């Protein structure tokens, strides 16, 4: 019956996973109403919530999945959560949260200690030269001037953002991680939890020894092959099968996952839904692999790439095999409102050459990359009847962006006029490139100044020899090349008519001289028979024999 735990004949100390999905859902729903989203920041004011089917004293690990606030109240749970964040390279979030907790406990009258702790927190987590910077948005940035008048709640907004980031992002992955599943299984079997950071669960002294059997005897039904612990007992007193225990474990975990998915995800912090969906699918495949006894390769955590965005913030991207760098960054750029074609990707420390986005993203595992935004606009060259695409850094001015195209055509800034289509007023070349992003500009020249390519067209182009032009355009970016090809086809009427007769004569001449060898052309006039092959009458200096 919903609302009461199913005892199943399990002893009091082992009733960790014997709970139905409906109980977890109802408990989570009532708890969600009692706990405000991100409203309780201090660990001393975290709500206790309604009664839980898990006793926090006897089953503390199972209670960690109830809520993020309950996890923070347990020192052991907070230590395991910190260890999990270290593996994800984001331990600075929980470290910053704990530092803010200690800072709020300082009395407001103790201005000296407040100033010292505020200085330490700011320069370690919030300044532009911080050793462990946290990921907060621009609205929560603080200047160093606020340290002159410290208050116990001066970091409340920043702590709230990090709290929401951990609650709706990191905590969701923690309850699905193999680390939490190990702790949950150890508690279900009665084994002591290992210390966070060690490699084995339980100590060798406290672990039970394998039962010794007499000759001819076998282990009873339900006891694991390694003989560490007997399994939970069923209603008839017989131990439950290992597969049934796994089903109970999976059921409790699925209940916790469903409860987490029912919560609100409208957080002010960054939350990559596509990334969470992938983590959920990885957790599901890991659970299935445990149930079927397959390899443990699915449970291995993937490697991440640290991505520094143009606005100064950072994000973690999972480097999955089989995905390109373009696919890995597509979700981050879409979430931040960035156009991926206008982004250049550089390795931190090697910013001379941009990375190719079509290679496998596993090359960036455990690496740091920096994204630089590029401003693109189209420039219509009136003298050439051509449209080119220009990409430049946002910090550049218009005259700096136009310098390469002007140098290519042999022009200077004094000989051109830049304006928008339909306007005659020239634009100020000192304006930044960001002011003309995604626009089309017109580059006009006075009548006395002509572009070099418009004045001196190569004979090959005037005769319509397209292979050389295509070879030149093939080195340009695809967008530029396509634009150039379109302009070339649109200006066909300005070209000179090809000499068809001369072209036919040239083709005939090429066909007639098609047979070559190393000695030259093989023509009939050039064929000379060797002397030993000639007839006696054809040999030079030969006389006819008398009749």
Swiss-Prot record:
Residues making up the signal peptide according to the UniProt record: none
A Gene Ontology molecular function term of the record: GTPase activating protein binding
Annotated RBD domain residues: 303-374, 376-446
Effect of inactivating the gene: No visible phenotype. Mice show an enhancement of postsynaptic long-term potentiation (LTP) responses in the CA2 neurons of the hippocampus that is correlated with an increase of spatial learning and object recognition memory (OMR).
Keyword Ribonucleoprotein: no
SUPFAM superfamilies membership: Regulator of G-protein signaling, RGS, Ubiquitin-like
Positions carrying Phosphoserine: 20, 42, 45, 143, 199, 203, 218, 289
Main location: nucleus
PANTHER family noted in UniProt: REGULATOR OF G-PROTEIN SIGNALING 14, REGULATOR OF G-PROTEIN SIGNALING LOCO
The protein's assembly and partners: Interacts with GNAI1 and GNAI2. Interacts with GNAI3. Interacts with GNAO1. Interacts (via RGS and GoLoco domains) with GNAI1; the interaction occurs in the centrosomes. Interaction with GNAI1 or GNAI3 (via active GTP- or inactive GDP-bound forms) prevents association of RGS14 with centrosomes or nuclear localization. Interacts with RABGEF1; the interactions is GTP-dependent. Interacts with RAP2A; the interactions is GTP-dependent and does not alter its function on G(i) alpha subunits either as GAP or as GDI. Associates with microtubules.
Protein purpose: Regulates G protein-coupled receptor signaling cascades. Inhibits signal transduction by increasing the GTPase activity of G protein alpha subunits, thereby driving them into their inactive GDP-bound form. Besides, modulates signal transduction via G protein alpha subunits by functioning as a GDP-dissociation inhibitor (GDI). Has GDI activity on G(i) alpha subunits GNAI1 and GNAI3, but not on GNAI2 and G(o)-alpha subunit GNAO1. Has GAP activity on GNAI0, GNAI2 and GNAI3. May act as a scaffold integrating G protein and Ras/Raf MAPkinase signaling pathways.
Protein name: Regulator of G-protein signaling 14
Gene transcribed to yield this protein: Rgs14
